[in-house]
């Protein structure tokens, strides 16, 4: 079966086409700046990569271009060769406990959740509808970033705000990066040969979050009602005193929406360092002795360590700490700065093993009382696996 995994933004569309259940990558690509006359379309096929700039007015045109290119490049013979498409959808609220086949009813449910994720769900829906318009008979599945966290107990997900906020508006912790956490959890269960493994997973890219996992289930996570909660990230502040919003509104004569935008897009590593939201740039500046870059980095690391310590207590000990995603997989310095702060819990780093980049490896020493791993995530493959599972369930 050929299954496509799609991750759609407001002006972008990232995709992979995989052969399932063999899990072989056939091709991948990225369409950026949708809605402009200088959009870019990049297609990678085995060792061959093509890129072109052209006008792409909307997502429907982007999807048409993508599917036509697959035929033109002889990746597929006809559109019907694609058996299913899986869409990453950021917010599933409490309505979705699993990935789901997409029909009018399910799409309407996703639309009803747009006020919970106004930056993400509308873009996801545009992509779903574009595929429907171009290829109406295509089997489509929604895979949600929040689903994995639906196992979090109420005492861990509910805020101590007026209970009516939850009853009326479903204000609660939802958590994100769930597709990644699902994949890493399954990888670690196999690696440790232990279904009831207790894990703390640190997903560290431009967005950063942590998750406490017990026996394959999320029991707590650092992101909350939105991805803004938790640790400082590339441009997000992470946790702050909510009273700061009113204070800044009065001092700067700003509205709530503008301040929220500042917290989402102008804070975190970028806000404190005043240099960049990219951790690679921050690490390069630290090597040059830049104190502001060091401060931004130290604040982030401190908060990550706080969550790890908290989840260690919550889980009553762990089988493994796992680093994944861009920085988690590729920065030995990032990992070492965290591990050395966890020596009180019995973590001992193996400096040589920690030099690993982008492949599965244990990074703690043989005399370490705790194990830490690097495990590359693969959200696209996880989505494809969900599509295959739902396809078999629906089509049997």
UniProtKB/Swiss-Prot annotation:
Keyword Transmembrane helix on entry: no
Quote the EC number: 2.7.2.1
Positions with a binding annotation for substrate: 88
Q: Which cofactors are reported in the record for this sequence?
A: Mg(2+); Mn(2+)
In the record, which residues are listed under signal peptide?
Answer: none
EC class: transferase
InterPro entries (alphabetical): Ac/propionate_kinase (IPR004372), Aliphatic_acid_kin_short-chain (IPR000890), Aliphatic_acid_kinase_CS (IPR023865), ATPase_NBD (IPR043129)
Q: Which Pfam families match?
A: Acetate_kinase
This enzyme catalyses:
acetate + ATP = acetyl phosphate + ADP
Top-rank taxon, per record: Bacteria
NCBIfam families, alphabetized: ackA (TIGR00016)
Q: How does it assemble?
A: Homodimer.
The record's similarity note reads:
Belongs to the acetokinase family.
Protein name according to UniProt: Acetate kinase
Species name: Phytoplasma australiense
């Amino acid at each position: 079966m050929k299954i496509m995994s799609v991750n759609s933004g407001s002006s972008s569309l990232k995709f992979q086409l995989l052969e399932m259940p063999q899990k072989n990558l056939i091709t991948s690509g990225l369409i950026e700046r949708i809605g402009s006359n200088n959009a870019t379309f990049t297609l990678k096929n085995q060792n061959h990569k093509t890129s072109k700039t052209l006008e792409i007015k909307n997502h429907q045109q982007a999807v048409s271009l993508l599917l036509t290119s697959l035929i033109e490049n002889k990746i597929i013979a006809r559109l019907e060769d694609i058996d299913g498409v899986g869409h990453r959808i950021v917010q599933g609220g409490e309505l979705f406990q699993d990935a789901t086949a997409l029909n009018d009813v399910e799409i309407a449910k996703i639309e009803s959740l747009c006020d919970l994720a106004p930056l993400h769900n509308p873009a996801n829906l545009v992509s779903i509808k574009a595929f429907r318009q171009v290829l109406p008979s295509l089997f489509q599945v929604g895979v949600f970033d929040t689903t994995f966290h639906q196992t979090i107990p109420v005492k861990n997900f509910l805020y101590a705000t007026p209970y009516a906020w939850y009853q009326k508006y479903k204000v609660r912790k939802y958590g994100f990066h769930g597709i990644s956490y699902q994949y890493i959890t399954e990888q670690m269960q196999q690696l440790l040969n232990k279904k009831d493994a207790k894990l703390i997973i640190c997903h560290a890219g431009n967005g950063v979050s942590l998750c406490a996992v017990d026996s394959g289930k999320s029991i707590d996570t650092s992101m909350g009602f939105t991805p803004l909660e938790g640790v400082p990230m590339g441009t997000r502040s992470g946790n702050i005193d909510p009273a700061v919003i009113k204070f800044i509104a009065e001092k700067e004569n700003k509205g709530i929406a503008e301040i929220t935008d500042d917290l989402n897009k102008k804070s975190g590593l970028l806000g404190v360092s005043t240099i960049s939201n990219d951790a690679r740039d921050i690490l390069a500046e630290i090597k040059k002795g830049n104190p502001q870059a060091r401060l931004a980095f130290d604040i982030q690391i401190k908060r990550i360590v706080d969550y790890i310590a908290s989840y260690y207590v919550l889980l009553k000990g762990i089988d493994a700490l796992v680093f994944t995603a861009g920085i988690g997989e590729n920065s030995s310095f990032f990992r070492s700065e965290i591990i050395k702060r966890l020596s009180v819990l019995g973590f001992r780093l193996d400096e040589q093993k920690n030099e690993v980049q982008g492949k599965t490896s244990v990074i703690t020493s043989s005399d370490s009382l705790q194990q830490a791993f690097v495990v590359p995530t693969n959200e696209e493959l996880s989505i494809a696996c969900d599509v295959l599972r739902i396809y078999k369930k629906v089509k049997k």
